[in-house]
Amino acid sequence: MKTQLDSLTAFFMQNVPERAGRGFDSQIDGMKVISAARDVGNGQYRLSVLRYTALLSWERFPFRLVDPQLLVALLEVWMDEHAAPVLEETGIENTEADWDVTLEDEETATVVLSIPLADELVIRPDAKGLIPYRGERWSLVEPEIWTALSATVYGVDESGAPVGES
């Protein structure tokens, strides 16, 4: 299963210049399990939401060669495009990042980013699954969400009104 931290880590690794990314590391610091059970469709069931603080660090970041604002911009872009909607759904509002920068010498610094992230803990029936639940075997899965692109809404008569793409 790919986590939000996995996604953010891969994004930074793909977009930060190689020299600046040599001392890069990412890990989870602290985790809270939020009860948020519900049927999410397609035979899937969400047990809970895992909220944690992601720590990403760059040792010996060459701030004179690579503008440190690149890291901030990349985080903002990733948050806008990839951050889990489960944060809003479960009422998690404080998603502000904390940046800690320590100068090492005239050309490098250690940069540490801490940011709250969340992942859904979703299971699906699977005869070979490792999780016994409600008389069945289940496996952990990445949530699969289907989005309707069009529909027809019926009111009081048989003439429907199309919605979305046709």
Regions found by a protein language model. Name each.
Residues 1-13:
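Polar/acidic, low-complexity leader/linker segments enriched in S/T/G and N/D
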